[in-house]
Amino acid sequence: MAWFFAPEPVMVTADEALKGGRHPVLENPAPHTVLGTPVTGPWKEGQQRIWIGLGCFWGVEQMYWQMDGVEGTSVGYAGGFTPNPTYREVCSGRTGHTEIVEVVYDPSKISLEQLVARGLEAHDPTQGFRQGNDVGTQYRSAYYTENEEDAARVKAVVDAYGETLKQHGFGEITTEIGVISPSEYFLAEDYHQQYLDKNPDGYCPHHSTGIPCGVEA
């Protein structure tokens, strides 16, 4: 019996990436179907945001909109090169983007560290360009912030969790941490927004390691 293996995904370069579109794929998003909040603002005074990639964004968005202190979520693409990408383009692996959830939160009710820890516990951050059977650079683990201070706070939580995972026999964490501007986050199509609210029987599993992060709630 012959076995055939797909090649490992490779990150596209800026020169190789698709050129993208001139206009966003979702220019006038409807309010959040669960929270009722505007997807693109205006935000309340004091609200903050972070962009989180843990694999398939459907289940990740649902997980975060259910958390106390989270006041807005949306799904989209970030971390790559192609402006205004479509879902199909992102899935081709030729945009450099990963599937992302934007989380808008009230820092007086929930901390950045708690949001990061919840994400780490909900997926396997050692899998590189995959989560479970979902394979591709668009499924990579990532946290993006608006400033270096928040990125450093994210890194501290991720590094500590990496040491915990090593003690349990896991490999190196491959989570990408970076600073982006809001203009570098591109909303996904309306079909994907709050997908599991619109499609209660939809399927989007988490791939947790089962190892707690240790950040206090």
Curated annotation (Swiss-Prot):
Its EC number is 1.8.4.11. It catalyses: L-methionyl-[protein] + [thioredoxin]-disulfide + H2O = L-methionyl-(S)-S-oxide-[protein] + [thioredoxin]-dithiol; [thioredoxin]-disulfide + L-methionine + H2O = L-methionine (S)-S-oxide + [thioredoxin]-dithiol. Keywords: Oxidoreductase. It comes from the Bacteria. It holds the Pfam family PMSR. GO terms for biological process: cellular response to oxidative stress; protein modification process. One of its GO terms (cellular component) is cytoplasm. SUPFAM superfamilies: Peptide methionine sulfoxide reductase. GO terms for molecular function: L-methionine-(S)-S-oxide reductase activity; peptide-methionine (S)-S-oxide reductase activity. The active site is at C56. InterPro entries: Met_Sox_Rdtase_MsrA_dom, Met_Sox_Rdtase_MsrA_sf, MsrA_MetSO_reductase. Coiled coil: none annotated. NCBIfam families: msrA. Has an important function as a repair enzyme for proteins that have been inactivated by oxidation. Catalyzes the reversible oxidation-reduction of methionine sulfoxide in proteins to methionine. Belongs to the MsrA Met sulfoxide reductase family. This is Peptide methionine sulfoxide reductase MsrA.
